[in-house]
Amino acid sequence: MSSLNQYIRPVKSRLSYISFIRNISITQSSINSTIKDNESISKTTTIPENIQQAKELAGYRALEVPEFKVLGSTSNGGNSTSSSCSSSILSINVPPSVPIYIRRGSLLSIYGIQEISSIDSVRSQLQFPNFWQRLIYGGYISGYQKLISTTPFSLLISSKSRTIMNGGNSSTEKSFVNLILDGTTDWAILDKSALQVYTGNSLSITMHKLPKFISKKLSRSLKNNNNSSNKKLETGLFSWKKMGYTLLSGRGKIGLVGNGNNSGCSIYNINLNQDEEILINKNNLLAITVNGPYDLQNCIIKYQFPIINNSNNNNNNNNSNNMTKNIKESGNIVKPKLIEPTTWNLIILKIKNINNRIKKFFQFINKYTLNLKTTSYNYLSGNQEFIKIIGPRNLLLQSNINHNGFNFTTRRKQQQKSIWPTTTDTTNTTTTKVDNTSSTPKDYLNYVTIEPDKGAIFKSTSDFSETIETIEKKKKNKGKDINTTPI
């Protein structure tokens, strides 16, 4: 073994000085510098910092429920009475396989579709929900476009529809308000053109008849408080022009539109507490919370501003004053004396009886025409459509009223506003007077004379006889050559 070690040791020492080197060559394709130049030339987008004061719309992809967002809205979270400032565009982010219903003619844009999907994945279908009920109760037909896709996408919805049947020619501005139904409360929509967008698999939309009279429950409570008569009280909602309302129940999301102005808030939310009352014009009432389809008659009463009946009050006051005077003057009750009637006394008695009968006749007419007076007074003063709502309720009010029909005058006024300037400068005001005196038109000829001292002189005349005489006189006097060239 020792002999083998002698031979192995020098070999190991030599191997330790040997190093193995491996050469690896990497081939790389040459980069052409013109590619970047071509990309910069054909670039069609810019960085977001270059676009200012414009809200960016991004399509969301990880969604389970639709998202409604009113663009440009502000809300007062701390106040009990909150308002949504007017905005005419609604942005909706829709998850896959969730249908959304949009009023026909209100779709602005479909975006948020990238390379993972295509526009062909969005399916559209036109539907007319509650066709016969809306035609009978409201006298109108509303078409809704159903959109559904297997991939997420986003929408932009306008508050005004472009179709004529849905108020496309309306001159009033509209704005959005969003409602979330969680199944605990229902909403009664009183404006037929308010429902713009809705979604929800368990959302129920039905049409019901507006109640004409209040319920027995409400009438009993009013009798206990005011001791009123047994006459049936009206709700003030029913009319032959408008006989129905839309009931929203279940779970889902709704986008309502109300009439107003873009310069300020147009839809307001009012929260009524228990036994709290409010007077509202029924045309401005957009929606109200209810508990089922038969709850409107439990909270709404027609209101008429009362008229003070001066004749009855004066008669009652006079009778009471006479009674008090007789009691004060006569401490002791005096028995009436029997007097033999004369013919004159009989005549006076008959006149008094006729006078009393005439008074009773006019009091009877005044009593039964008081209702006619109040209705005519409220109609002339513009208060004939007021209703009283008793809480607890949530109300949505719109600041303007939409008048249906073609309005050519407003369109003509808008055209005039676009032609004529909206502001006038009061500092620099100049008045021009037009001379209406008749004058006969004349033909004038222009000519130029070249003189060595003055140069070219331009003149206009209707007759060359005078100019020729002056030129000849100058030739005789000065003896200079004057060249005249007509134009």
From Swiss-Prot:
- The answer to whether keyword Cell division applies is no
Q: Which UniProt keywords apply?
A: Mitochondrion, Transit peptide
What cellular component terms from Gene Ontology apply here?
mitochondrial inner membrane
Where is this protein found?
Mitochondrion
Pfam families recorded for this chain?
AIM24 (PF01987)
Segment annotated as transit peptide: 1-62
Q: Which InterPro entries match?
A: AIM24, AIM24_sf
GO terms of biological process kind: inner mitochondrial membrane organization
Q: What family name appears in the similarity comment? A: Belongs to the AIM24 family.
Question: What's the protein name?
Answer: Altered inheritance of mitochondria protein 24, mitochondrial
Q: Which gene encodes it?
A: AIM24
